[in-house]
Regions:
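Sec/Tat signal peptide C-region and signal peptidase I cleavage site
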Residues: 21-23
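Conserved HGGG/HGGXW glycine-rich cap/lid loop of the alpha/beta-hydrolase fold
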Residues: 52-95
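Flexible "cap/lid" subdomain of the alpha/beta-hydrolase fold that forms the substrate-access gate
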Residues: 26-39, 46-48, 58, 86, ...
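Catalytic histidine-centered segment of alpha/beta-hydrolase-like enzymes
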Residues: 287-296, 300
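Bacterial N-terminal signal peptides that target proteins for export
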Residues: 1-9
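Bacterial N-terminal signal peptides
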Residues: 9-18
């Protein structure tokens, strides 16, 4: 297995930690919004909305918080020249269903949603791409359903065992995770608005779409991802110990914008020991949490080249 022994900073939230990423040039076609196909998948009675573009091997792209399918606008056009590119609205967001209850956002259900999308496309497997919470879903899917996974691309989300290890052992990391612990508190969603959640979006035209999508979304559902899946501050150290997880058996490409400070670099250590095939890590100085937008040209070109060598 190839090792790229570079440590990067992690997780999500430029809007709450003020990372100041690179100015983003919106190079996506202006009509991409109108050119995508809209579809729905049935995940055990929960409607999962997704958009699609292109023909060829299937790529499924999964957004994080606070986001929706449009986060991938700068990758979809280039990749769709050779692939069938699907971008999902996760449950709780935009045009997907918003089931009530914390238990409805447990990781196994989020993984099953992606399986339903793959099935709706008439395929048995796909390249899985995930950012932030979408990255957590992507890691978990690759570990628990390798038969669905042709290759894995992760953006700004460390391997789950690395996150748990750092929260357990690193006091600074626990401090940097306060935003997530606050999201777990009852009623935290009352402090959110569509406009506030879209505040990180730099492109004015794109921000309009984001505000509209967030007004269709459920803020409580968004925070239920944290309540159902993120380590809790009141857990003892034994409960925070990383559980043994299966190794990832496909090739992995991982990006990280080094301007993202919500997770410290130690969370990346040892990731190469958890992947059986080649593991490529790309760190991008000056880019923040939303690296797919902050460094869109580099991310897209790297994805295109990496996939061309592996997926035909």
């Amino acid at each position: 297995m190839k090792r790229t022994n570079i440590v990067w900073t992690a997780l999500f939230i430029a809007i709450f930690v003020g990372t100041g990423p690179l100015p983003a040039k919106d190079s996506a076609p202006k009509d991409l919004w109108d050119r995508v196909e809209h579809h729905n998948a049935d995940s055990s009675g929960v409607k999962i909305h997704y958009v699609a573009l292109g023909k060829g091997p299937l790529i499924v792209m999964i957004h994080g918080f606070p986001d929706f399918w449009y986060t991938w606008r700068k990758q979809m056009d280039a990749l769709s020249a050779h692939y069938r590119v699907v971008a999902v609205d996760q449950r709780g967001y935009d045009l997907s269903d918003r089931p009530a209850g914390i238990e409805q956002y447990a990781m196994p259900l989020l993984v099953d949603d992606i399986g339903a999308v793959i099935k709706a496309e008439g395929r048995s497997s796909a390249v899985i791409v995930g950012h932030d919470w979408g990255g957590a879903v992507a890691w978990t899917l690759a570990m628990t359903h390798p038969e669905w996974t042709q290759a894995l691309i992760i953006l700004n989300l460390p391997h789950p065992s690395g996150i748990q290890r750092e929260i357990k052992n690193n006091p600074q990391q626990r401090m940097n995770s306060e935003y997530a612990f606050n999201f777990q508190k009852p009623g935290a969603e009352k402090n959110l608005t569509a406009e506030k959640l879209a505040g990180w979006v730099k492109d004015d035209a794109a921000r309009v779409h984001y505000i509209e999508a967030f007004k269709r979304s459920d803020f409580e559902a968004m925070l239920n991802y944290y309540r159902a899946n993120y380590p809790r501050p009141d857990q003892d150290s034994a409960a925070l110990a990383p559980a043994p997880l299966p190794k990832v058996t496909v090739a992995v490409l991982e990006f990280h914008g080094l301007g993202d400070q919500a997770l410290l670099p130690g969370a990346l250590n040892g990731t190469w020991d958890l992947v059986e095939k080649d593991f490529t890590l790309v760190t991008i100085p000056g880019a923040g949490h939303f690296v797919q937008q902050d460094a869109s040209d580099l991310v897209t070109a790297t994805m295109t080249d990496w996939l061309a060598r592996r997926i035909h």
